[in-house]
From Swiss-Prot:
This is Ion-translocating oxidoreductase complex subunit C. It comes from Salmonella schwarzengrund (strain CVM19633). Its main location: membrane. Residues 534-709 are annotated as: Disordered. Residues 368-397, 407-436 form the 4Fe-4S ferredoxin-type domain. Residues 645-665 have a biased composition (Basic and acidic residues). Coiled coil: none annotated. Binds 2 [4Fe-4S] clusters per subunit. GO terms for molecular function: 4 iron, 4 sulfur cluster binding; electron transfer activity; metal ion binding.
Length: 732
């Protein structure tokens, strides 16, 4: 009885919420054995056929490659890809790949040579002799990834499991309609699958190993039981057929009764799951030394005349496989990669087969049915009842349609496995899975942008911290360099400061003169006497001819005679019109001073200028000026009462006459006598004389003022002295 209860507990299974039972449509392809497909003339191998970054290229255009040769290097999650056959690399360029939008990805294009030669293979038949790390590295470098549809690198998955794994589950459910790749593989290669399971169990060392398979695969179940007849470490669990029981979280719950938490992974509860196709690839990589270069693909649908499962080389164009299966396309023919619920329609047939390709479905028009028009949601909750992940698809639909990313995330849209059960039962024909895929892609893009922004912020903060550290270090160096100078340096600095202060004190010391004493002006007097002696020496250096008293000058004699006559006439007129006045001593003194000044000036001019010959032109001009002045004086004397002689005016007129005479002498000495110029100058002189006569007749004459006469005399003396000094400077 105890053994019966133990056996019951051992084979116990659980159930999950939701799920559907669509038509299976598996009998079209699971009845024929696996077969090989002829090599395609050209292969397109995308560098990224897994979850993660693409590997680093290790081949170039023109290289000859063999089957199994690595085309890229794999580090971390970068999984390498290998050549599916021998041939020549003709291009490395972007090419459309297995994607709903047929996005272009970098690919290696190889022209097959038809020889299909392998690289040298080295298998580990005794894999137990190798360490766990060596086995994981070999699995990774041989390009093994999850072949159930996710494409996660198997080596990374095994490495991440570590010692936490207590249960290893082999997924053999294959629940989606039409797909029979795993079913046929278990029928034909059960022993190799079990050997691969043993390798995985050797790496992980779990407490139990479970194989979950649906009850709609009787031939596969019988083959596995035959292989596992003597095995006590591996349990085969047959579960009811229900879609999507092949999901990782759903199968985990069925076999263990444990639920994976929201946002978590199966490894969080000590469970690791692998596909039967992955177990077979592990066996070939470890034991046979063959990288993954091919996989089983189901070719099915009413548009295919020879449905079945084939060994398809990775990189083979879809068109080549369908043509080998007898593809008969209709006018509006569609081809689906994957199953009818979780697959996607290919935009064209030139895309290559990759590691996650498990089925190519080519249905007829009647098989798929007429397309249904999308209607509004009626809130019937049928989608929520069918959801195996316990989500609310109708709420996620509204959040996705309204771009409410935060609410969609809060309602666990990331836990959606995109099984399509909600869309299958929707009476409004709403393609819910398409909305959910788009929403998850947008959320991932937002998170990626936030991650980049956070990384940029971290780099900026690190840079600011580095700059602050450098600044602090720089200030510390400056402070350490600013030490006190040595004692001898301080002595030198103090001496220099003392000298500067002494000089400043001497410069600012005031001059003190004692009371009752006279200042010492001997230096100033000596300087003045030196200047006088220098001036006398310069005068003595002139030729004796310059200092000789010139003889009589007819020109000056004529001018003086004219002035004398004019003064005589003016005095006669004043004497005849006015009574005699007593002699004024002040006027006499002024006139005497004026006469002395004129005499000194004439002597200086005579001593500084050489005697020149008489110029008839200048003589005529001077005579005309003298006559004009005489007429002016006569008119003033005849029209106005006689006035006393004004010394100021006389001095000014005499100075003007002397200036004109000097100017005319200079001009006469530099130019030859020209009769025309002489006539012009005489005319100008007569015009000036007439103008002066007119002005004299129109302006009144003011009586003479003794004070003004004295001032005028003083001004005349100053002007005479200034003229004499200027003459000396000019001569020097």
């Amino acid at each position: 009885m105890l053994k019966l209860f133990s056996a019951f507990r051992k084979d116990k299974i659980w159930d999950f919420d939701g799920g559907i039972h669509p038509p299976e449509m598996k009998t079209q392809s699971n009845g024929t054995p696996l077969r090989q497909v002829p090599l395609a003339p050209r292969f397109v191998i995308p560098l990224k056929q897994h979850i993660g970054a693409e590997g680093e290229l290790c081949v170039s255009v023109g290289d000859r490659v063999l089957r199994g040769q690595a085309l890229t290097r794999g580090r971390g999650r970068m999984l390498p890809v290998h050549a599916p056959t021998s041939g020549t690399v003709i291009a490395i360029a972007p090419h459309s790949t297995a994607h709903p939008s047929a996005l272009a990805e970098l690919s290696v294009i190889i022209d097959a040579d038809g020889e299909d030669r392998w690289i040298e293979r080295e298998g580990w038949s005794d894999y137990r002799a190798h360490s766990r790390e060596a086995l994981i590295e070999r699995i990774h470098q041989y390009g093994v990834a999850g072949l159930g549809g996710a494409g996660f690198p198997t080596g990374v998955k095994l490495q991440g499991g570590g010692d936490k794994i207590t249960t290893l589950i082999i997924n053999a459910a294959e629940c989606e309609p039409y797909i029979t790749a795993d079913d046929r593989l278990m029928q034909d290669c059960a022993a190799q699958i079990v050997e691969g399971i043993r390798i995985l169990a050797h790496i992980l060392q779990p407490r139990e190993v479970l194989i979950g398979i649906e009850d709609n695969k009787p031939q596969a179940i019988s083959m596995l039981r035959a292989v596992l007849a003597d095995a006590h470490d591996i349990s085969l669990r047959v579960i009811p057929t229900k879609y999507p029981s092949g999901g990782a979280k759903q199968l985990t719950q069925i076999l263990t009764g444990k639920q994976v938490p929201h946002g978590g992974r199966s490894s969080d509860i000590g469970v690791l799951m692998q596909n039967v196709g992955t177990a077979y690839a592990v066996k070939r990589a470890v034991v046979d030394g063959e990288p993954i270069t091919e996989r089983v693909v189901t070719l099915t649908g009413e548009a295919v005349s020879r449905p079945g499962n084939v060994w398809a080389r990775l990189g083979t164009p879809v068109r080549h496989l369908l043509n080998d299966a007898g593809f008969c396309p209709s006018a509006d023919q569609m081809v689906i990669m994957g199953g009818p619920l979780m697959g996607f329609t290919l935009p064209w047939l030139d895309v290559p087969v990759v590691k996650i390709t498990n089925c190519l479905l080519a249905p007829s028009v009647t098989e798929m049915g007429a397309p249904q028009e999308e209607k509004s949601c009626i809130r019937c909750s049928a989608c929520a009842d069918a959801c195996p992940a316990d989500l609310l698809p109708q709420q996620l639909y509204w959040f996705s349609k309204g771009q409410q990313h935060d609410k969609a995330t809060a309602h666990h849209i990331a836990d959606c496995i995109e099984c399509g059960a909600c869309a299958w039962v929707c009476p409004s024909n709403i393609p819910l899975v398409q909305y959910f895929r788009q929403e998850k892609a947008e959320i991932n893009a937002i998170r990626l942008e936030e991650k980049r922004a956070a990384e940029a912020k971290a780099r900026f903060e690190a840079r600011q911290a580095r700059l602050e550290r450098e600044k602090a270090a720089r200030l510390a160096r400056h402070k350490s360099a600013a030490v006190q100078p040595a004692a001898k340096d301080q002595d030198a600095i103090a001496a220099a400061l003392a000298r500067v202060k002494e000089k400043q004190a001497q410069a600012t010391q005031p001059v003190v003169i004692q009371a009752g004493s006279l200042p010492d002006n001997s230096a100033v007097i000596a300087a003045r006497e030196a200047r006088k002696a220098q001036a006398r020496a310069k005068q003595a250096a002139h030729p004796m001819a310059d200092s000789a008293i010139p003889g009589d000058d007819p020109r000056k004699a004529a001018v003086e005679a004219a002035i004398a006559r004019a003064k005589a006439r003016k005095q006669e007129q004043q004497a005849g019109s006015e009574p005699a006045e007593p002699v004024d001593p002040r006027k006499a003194a002024v006139e005497a001073a004026i006469a002395r000044a004129k005499a000194r000036k004439q002597e200086q001019q005579a001593g500084s200028e050489p005697a020149e010959p008489v110029d008839p032109r200048k003589a005529a001009v001077e005579a005309a000026i003298a006559r004009a002045k005489a007429r002016k004086q006569e008119k003033q004397a005849g029209s106005e009462p006689a006035e006393p002689v004004d010394p100021r005016k006389a001095a000014v007129e005499a100075a003007i006459d002397r200036a004109k005479a000097r100017k005319q002498e200079q001009q006469a000495g530099s130019e030859p006598v020209d009769p025309r110029k002489a006539a012009v100058e005489a005319a100008i002189a007569r015009a000036k004389a007439r103008k002066q006569e007119q002005q004299a007749g129109s302006e009144p004459v003011e009586p003479a003022d003794p004070r003004k006469a004295a001032v005028a005399a003083a001004i005349a003396r100053v002007q005479a002295k200034k003229a004499a000094q200027q003459q000396v400077v000019n001569e020097d």
